[in-house]
Swiss-Prot record:
Molecular-function GO terms, alphabetical: neuropeptide hormone activity; type 2 galanin receptor binding; type 3 galanin receptor binding
Protein name: Spexin prohormone 1
InterPro entries membership: Spexin
Source organism (scientific name): Danio rerio (Zebrafish)
A Pfam family hit: Spexin
Length: 102
């Protein structure tokens, strides 16, 4: 009885392995080839954030970190993390107080 279970387990494992191998051989190879992107497609893929690279000179840092992205907000006041956290906590407490029945 135990030998039958062991034999069935080996047969199942062999069947799964054969299925995996046959599916991997039949996978389309063309989709994994490198594409020749047009300049317009590269601009689309690059998006609004620009090219990002890691400089070999550690003093320069990432180009992404040195570029200031434009924002639509007219608010020029920089908000510190502690002020932002206090503001968020205040909003959450107000929402909780409004939901509580009296």
């Amino acid at each position: 009885m135990k030998d039958l279970r062991t034999l069935a387990a080996y047969a199942l494992a062999l069947l799964l392995l054969a299925t995996f191998v046959s599916h991997s051989w039949s996978a389309p190879k063309g989709s994994f080839q490198r594409r020749n992107w047009t300049p317009q497609a590269m601009l689309y893929l690059k998006g609004t954030q620009g090219r990002r690279f890691v400089s070999e000179d550690r003093n320069e840092g990432d180009l992404y970190d040195t570029i200031r992205l434009e924002s639509r907000s007219q608010n020029t006041e920089n908000l510190s993390i502690s002020k932002a956290a206090a503001f968020l906590l205040n909003i959450l407490q107000q929402a909780r107080d409004e939901d509580e029945p009296y």
